[in-house]
Amino acid sequence: MSSSVLSKKRKVSGPDSSLDSSWSPTYSVMFGVPPGPTNEMSKNKEMDIDESLYSRQLYVLGHEAMKHLQASSVLISGLQGLGVEIAKNIILGGVKAVTLHDQGIAQWADLSSQFCLREEDIGKNRAEISQPRLAELNSYVPVFAYTGPLIEEFLSGFQVVVLTNTPLEYQLQVGEFCHSHGIKLVVADTRGLVGQLFCDFGEEMILTDSNGEQPLSAMVSMITKENPGIVTCLEDSRHGFESGDFISFTEVQGMSELNGIGPIEIKVLGPYTFSICDTSSFSEYIRGGIVSQVKVPRKINFKPLLASLAEPEFVVTDFAKCCHPAQLHIGFQALHQFCTQHSRPPRPHNEEDAEELVTLAQSVNAQALPAVQQDCLDIDLIRKLAYVAAGDLAPMNAFFGGLAAQEVMKACSGKFMPIRQWLYFDALECLPEHRVAFMEDKCLPHQNRYDGQVAVFGSDLQEKLGKQKYFLVGAGAIGCELLKNFAMIGLGCGEDGEITVTDMDTIEKSNLNRQFLFRPWDITKLKSETAAAAVRDINPHIRIFSHQNRVGPETEHVYDDDFFQKLDGVANALDNVDARLYVDRRCVYYRKPLLESGTLGTKGNVQVVVPFLTESYSSSQDPPEKSIPICTLKNFPNAIEHTVQWARDEFEGLFKQSAENVNQYLTDPKFMERTLQLAGTQPLEVLEAIHCSLVLQRPQTWADCVTWAYQHWHTQYSHNIQQLLHNFPPAQLTSSGALFWSGPKRCPHPLTFDINNPLHLDYVMAAANLFAQTYGLGGSQDCAVVAKLLQSLPVPKFAPKSGIRIHVSEQELQSTSATTIDDSHLEELKTALPTPDKLLGFKMYPIDFEKDDDSNFHMDFIVAASNLRAENYGISPADRHKSKLIAGKIIPAIATTTSAIVGLVCLELYKVVQGHQQLESYKNSFINLALPLFSFSAPLAPECHQYYDQEWTLWDRFDVQGLQPSGEEMTLKQFLDYFKTEHKLEVIMLSQGVSMLYSVFMPASKLKERLDQPMTEIVSCVSKQKLGHHVKSLVFELCCNSDSGDDIEVPYVRYIIR
């Protein structure tokens, strides 16, 4: 928009706003006096970060990037479905301010994906209608609506400008101005099942962190004195570095020159070795050292839109379609020409318009530079682009809205690698697998809310979507996005359709940052009810029912055969593997499609499970997380993760487990009997803890609680450390002559209590208050009172104990756990405990750890306890934010990833509802928006097994009718005979769940007794549980021999009893 391209007073207008909204709103570019919103935005001062709101996002972006976000104003031009998705995500993300620009009015087709519009809003300005609804998402982000022309001074007030679904001429003009004035530009466009994204972040963008991963660190075992020096790390884990990484050293003994020098670039030589700078003039290496990765900022540059259009760089999203980006780059330019000539997009599935677009694409291709020109234009791809270009799909907008919003955040913060510079994505496999005569009249608009979707798929699929019955498990971040998309596409919105959503959780403040159906006034309300009400507001036709049940064995009377058999599919929105596995098993049993997805920060994945066609979720699993050895936690920590986990275990032992044991001892007559049957030293440990709680340490006053906390501080941070050093002095050598305190074992030192040290006082305050709470006593937050009490307390004396065994390995620990305990000491403890009848009415109050309440002392205790132990061992402390992440096992989350992932889920939903039967039509996906990385692959087919000539997969089973025509139930003998005669299988073992019902190795008397018993009677007898009235069938597992006596693997049995 420099004067060389456009005069200062010239105005460029797009098509009239009364035209088809799938083309564009009215666009104006004008230079002159800036409008009002810029002045209002200047009032938005820099504010502190609300960690209770942004906590999950902060674990993705970090505080520094978040501060940059809060200093950035963003303009979004174009408020159709894609624009509103981007706006939603960046408002939730917490930028300084957002201005919504649109001169177009809401039309019926907009309701296919624009979730801020209602049917009564038709004919009103999109930006003005969207502004108050988007402003509710985040009270920290002012949201303005602007419907006038864009002018130079106005654009100059923004750090980032986003253009959505805009004409190419308009993009070029705005792009030139933004590039020349240092304003970051994002251009996004979706056309039915095809989308485009472009980024221009200027010529000198500073990238502070390309991947967002936590800096790696490793322990050093050797550094050579040569050029270049070779560093070898301890062989307990790979260092994980890459050539070109920068690192720094600390705690190196001998070659101390390396400590504290600037970041050193490395070259990786192997999984445990890498080379550094010239170390030949340094001192000899003796021992120790920690090497840590350093994120070094670097500059990256971008071409302006015009130059990049001619010589594009592409981010490939699907390597099965690696030729598509260049083809679609030509196709989109042709599409812009078509729209300019006709003031509309190609008509849905119209052959005449498709032919014209192909001709235009051929012309564009012929004029393209050699680097872009395609030797062979993909005519079929260009035709499909024409067929769907008039469409507007909520899932595509959700996917591109997540990507574009993440690019906006990158532009604001310099965090994560931007898209350089073009990204194209298509989901054309969502169209019918067999190209039947797609009747154009089936895709024409009917002035209803699904017109944008009907333009792509036709009215028949719309009707089918309305009849679907789906079960959504979870109403958190993914659940909210799924429900929004379900409402937009019309899933379960017909007379015969329905959506059932269940979630037992209530809404917390930290949810509001990414679970966008919830508002501040919804805090403490049930998620499922609130989410259902919110999507009814988006689409009043949706038939949705909310439950508050956990999905598991205990609710199978609710989610029973009748419930599952009526479903068309299930969508998971869960946050733990066990629940996912359970739902997956149910879907396999009832042969229902499953849409599975998950996110972790900027990473996300989608898996589609289709009966008989794909493997199930349970067919493959990630390896289990590596746990911290107990000996490391108890005595030899070397990382802050170890001390935080130790503090977390302390919390459970001191304030929960002990109180629960006391209450069970006082109320359960069989508690003592069960405790004495525990393995190893557990009986002694449990009874000692109860004795302490009821006798030795039972407080009567607040002052007693302070005394206990003070004494416990000395036990943990002084006495226990002195005892450890008594057993293993600092200079102790191992049997091989090496220093005991070396490698991963850090030599600790005891602490001396200092009343003027805030960390020491924080520990006593938190521990004393929590201890008081477990006894129902009142606490105090008055530090002065606590300090005064502490001044009067004597310092506990330490005397080393002999005979104390400290385990230095897991093997030692396990061997000790198998040893017997001192029975006489156990009897003494049992005698010393007050009997329950002497403590009638007394009870303790166990505390459940809650990380997100900053007033309950829970995190105060964790932070203080962990950092004091870190000080013991010379480990760098962690702030409250990082400690909460580790202690609370928080899953980092951001709205952008959720939006993108759910968009991909719903693209798979289109295929499932249509009944696609080709495996390659479906796409499992993994994305990492930080890199950016996109990986799509066809699902795996289920593993095939065989017995005799019968092939089977996990989807197959034996269906056995348990009720005979006579009305009597099949006996065990009849069951065994059935498999012998009908399938030539000799059953040698039969089980149901964990219950063994039959085995050839059973005692003859038991076998004779069971053979004539009905199957359900045997199940009830063995499991000691009566079958509920909701149970209509049972699952049996078989071990069988063939007729030749060989072991063979066979499917499970569905035994039908009702």
UniProtKB/Swiss-Prot annotation:
It comes from the Eukaryota. ATP binds at residues 477, 503, 514, 527, 575-576. InterPro entries: E1_4HB, E1_FCCH, E1_FCCH_sf, ThiF/MoeB/HesA, ThiF_NAD_FAD-bd, Ub-activating_enz_E1_C, Ub-E1_IAD_1, UBA_E1_C_sf. Residues 1-22 are annotated as: Disordered. One of its GO terms (molecular function) is ATP binding. The active site is at residue 631. It is an enzyme of class 6 (ligase). There are two active sites within the E1 molecule, allowing it to accommodate two ubiquitin moieties at a time, with a new ubiquitin forming an adenylate intermediate as the previous one is transferred to the thiol site. This is Ubiquitin-like modifier-activating enzyme 1 Y. It comes from Mus musculus (Mouse). The lineage of its organism: Eukaryota, Metazoa, Chordata, Craniata, Vertebrata.
